[in-house]
């Protein structure tokens, strides 16, 4: 590989990663503002105009603090897991069309599913490496919850693949030009939305960091820079799941819109969907753990399996009919 090719690759990678990190930083500000207005208070409004520089101030503060490591923790894993979490959270964005993917993979949806499954390891190892009972319980809960809800996510993805006919995400744009998939498969979209809430450990499914019982969950022993990396990874995953939801069910490709507006439309829809995540957080109390698991294994799984069979069998059964 020539130095020029290597430099081009680095510039492409940075131009892909930096906007995501900036969006993640300002999503934290949006969250604090929305929650504060829902609770009849102002939220951050001191640092910069209307508190717009608050995420930058928070980031600088966290990264210049001294990173404290518990004496009984595993030194290598304790430092490596936050880096792994952020690395995976940024790698998953590669096949997403925004409007063009960084790598147009044939099996883009499978890549997304595989990479999101790997994030479980960063949670589990961080809880184990901390050598704290609260962190370990939080990590085990996170792993059980994430692995469980990935089952329904995979089946729903399979159903959408049946409708689009391809594993590449850009095909979904062509599929949804006449009508959004949310209209034809709204039960799948509703279950997908709730499963993404659980997959990203957001309220009311934030069992992993229940403050009243686990202090802060798997990241209880982390401070300063490593904590900031976990924080960035969590919010990057939230934005990724929302972008994927929009791509699957509310694709921003319009027949009459110029392609230059694709990114603006996508960003607006992702922001609105992220705001609904925050609305849910402000409105609902935390689920009990057994209710969380019953919701998936006793309600969502039978429904998604039935709908997957429906989406598989209907085109085949109608294919034999004569045209109207």
UniProtKB/Swiss-Prot annotation:
TM helices/strands, residue ranges: 10-30, 76-96, 107-127, 143-163, 178-198, 229-249, 260-280, 300-320
Catalytic activity: a ubiquinone + NADH + 5 H(+)(in) = a ubiquinol + NAD(+) + 4 H(+)(out)
Origin species: Excalfactoria chinensis
Top EC class of this enzyme: translocase
Similarity section: Belongs to the complex I subunit 1 family.
Compartments (UniProt record): Mitochondrion inner membrane
Membrane topology: Multi-pass membrane protein
Name assigned to this protein: NADH-ubiquinone oxidoreductase chain 1
Pfam families documented for this protein: NADHdh
Record PANTHER family: NADH DEHYDROGENASE SUBUNIT 1 (PTHR11432), NADH-UBIQUINONE OXIDOREDUCTASE CHAIN 1 (PTHR11432:SF3)
Domain of life (superkingdom): Eukaryota
Job of this protein: Core subunit of the mitochondrial membrane respiratory chain NADH dehydrogenase (Complex I) that is believed to belong to the minimal assembly required for catalysis. Complex I functions in the transfer of electrons from NADH to the respiratory chain. The immediate electron acceptor for the enzyme is believed to be ubiquinone.
Keywords in alphabetical order: Electron transport, Membrane, Mitochondrion, Mitochondrion inner membrane, NAD, Respiratory chain, Translocase, Transmembrane, Transmembrane helix, Transport, Ubiquinone
Record carries keyword DNA damage: no
Predominant location: mitochondrion
Originating gene: MT-ND1
GO cellular component, one term: mitochondrial inner membrane
GO-annotated molecular function: NADH dehydrogenase (ubiquinone) activity
Protein's GO biological process: aerobic respiration
